């Protein structure tokens, strides 16, 4: 117990074999035989254990509205609220809320590993670029579509601590 591990999973572990493969974008619903798909996972992408706890706060979005070729900066504060020093991997996910093609529910667009002493806090910043917002449209062209995007910052793909949104014009 002298060392606090801070590793994170680089894959998702499904609850059942029937969920595999699920490495493609899909819309929720039933299968061809009318059975409803099992939702949820055993261990989500980015999951990890720690002997301490972390609190996320103060999400700041540099611009609520951006153009398709603009960068955006996001930041938040992470504080070690436990009694041990530890590493945290702060993960940034986005979602195109109304895309013209089916996309993933959320996509990892950045992560930052930090080491904090008990009671210490640190501001974490991420930069979103047009490349990170784009998708391949139905004409097989890479584009940044106008519309609303959701921002999710957390400790794993399911343990989302902060949420926000912005718009691309």
Predicted feature residues:
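Short glycine/proline/serine/threonine-rich loop/turn segments at secondary-structure transition edges
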Residues: 132-148
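Alpha-helical context
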Residues: 32-37, 42, 92, 102-104, ...
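Secreted, periplasmic, or luminal enzymes acting at the cell surface/secretory milieu
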Residues: 1-87, 93, 113, 118, ...
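Short, loop-centered acidic/histidine patches that primarily coordinate divalent metals
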Residues: 95, 129-131, 154-156
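Short acidic, flexible loop segments centered on an aromatic residue
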Residues: 83-100, 106-108
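Intrinsically disordered, low-complexity Pro/Gly/Ser/Thr-rich segments with frequent PxxP/GP/PP motifs
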Residues: 100-136
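C-terminal edge beta-strand
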Residues: 164-166
């Amino acid at each position: 117990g002298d060392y606090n591990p801070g590793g994170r999973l680089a894959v998702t572990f499904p609850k059942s074999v029937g969920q595999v493969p699920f490495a493609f974008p899909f819309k929720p619903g039933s299968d061809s035989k009318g059975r409803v798909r099992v939702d949820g996972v055993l261990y989500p992408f980015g999951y990890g254990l720690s002997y301490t706890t972390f609190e996320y706060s103060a999400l700041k979005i540099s611009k609520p509205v951006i153009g398709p070729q603009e960068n955006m900066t996001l930041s938040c504060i992470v504080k070690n609220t436990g009694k041990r020093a530890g590493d945290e991997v702060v993960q940034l996910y986005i979602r195109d809320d109304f895309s013209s093609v089916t996309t993933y529910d959320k996509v990892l667009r950045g992560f930052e590993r930090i080491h904090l002493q008990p009671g210490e806090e640190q501001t974490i910043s991420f930069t979103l670029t047009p490349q990170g917002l784009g998708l391949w449209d139905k004409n097989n062209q890479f584009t940044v579509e106008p519309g609303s995007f959701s921002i999710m910052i957390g400790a794993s793909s399911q343990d989302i601590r902060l949420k926000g949104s912005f718009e691309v014009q």
